[in-house]
Amino acid sequence: MKIVIPGGSGQLGTILARELIAQDHQVIVLSRKPFLAPWPVVLWDAKNLGGWQASFDNADVVINLAGRSVNCRYNPENRSQILNSRVDATRVVGKAISNASTPPRVWLQASTATIYSHRFDSPNDDIRGVLGGNEPNVPDTWKFSIDVARAWEHAAEELDLPGTRRVLMRAAMTMSPEQDGVFAVLVGLVKRGLGGTNGDGAQYVSWIHDIDFVRSVFWLIDHDLSGPINLSSPNPLPNADFMRILRKAAKIPVGLPATRWMLELGAIFLKTETELILKSRRVVPSKLLASGFKFQFPTWEQAAEDLMTRWNSRQLTC
């Protein structure tokens, strides 16, 4: 297959492209900055149509991952960049698909599990899940993230594309032993003795192992699913359990807990937001499971053991 990955220069794009190439698919990555890779990299500005759109002709699949990182403080400038980078890129991808002489049969569009409400009572699935933003006393930063997710998905649905099946990938945190990812940050905290419970520890953590992320993307390409699809493990768990299991996998029995005020203060110094830690994301992938998808790493115990083994192996070879 010929597969185009706009915004594919980040961790997820690299993981996907590497596996696609290994399976003898043709991969083209669209990037705002040139970089060396084992696959063609085509420049685009993620906003306007240009010569890059020729790569869409005769493509089988487009996987749009473009969007500025949310690992920052949500000041006005960053908010504008977070929103516009997603909406602008998604709109222009839709236009390029519409203009293609032979449009791709599948458009996989990145979204986020953050779109769901902060809840503890029952999980949010992709059939009856409750979208967030209207909870009582919802923090402004949490509402902003949900508003971005809604606008992001809306941008993917603006055009009529009868020849292209669209999937909105509502992905949870993807855990990978690659450098600079969320797992690397968590392991760094654990190894410094700071991997204890965050806040009261009751908030749910939704996640997906990187191997299952890649497998689920392949599944979505090959199976007739459309609309919002949750890419997450079927077993989210409270933060206290999540961190305890990670410490066990890292063979570090103790981790200092962090209260909410400590996290808020730390987020200021680290130039990030506590929403990434304190919001309860209890998300399950009902549509994937109903379609027959089987997770290789359905539980955090299994995933954490594998990820730590791979992490330690990477450290030995670096």
What are the residue ranges of the model-derived segments?
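Mid/C-terminal beta-alpha module of Rossmann-like enzyme folds, strongest
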Residues: K2, S216, L220-K271, E305-C318
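N-terminal Rossmann NAD(P)H-binding glycine-rich loop of SDR-like oxidoreductase domains
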Residues: I3-Q23
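Conserved Rossmann-fold NAD(P)-dependent oxidoreductase catalytic core, especially the SDR/UDP-sugar
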Residues: R91-W142
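Flexible, glycine-rich beta-alpha linker
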Residues: I115-S117, T164-A184
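Active-site Tyr-X1-5-Lys
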Residues: P136-R166
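Alpha-helical substrate-binding/gating segment
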Residues: D160, V187-G196, A202-L237
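C-terminal amphipathic/interface module of NAD(P)-dependent oxidoreductases
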Residues: T274-C318
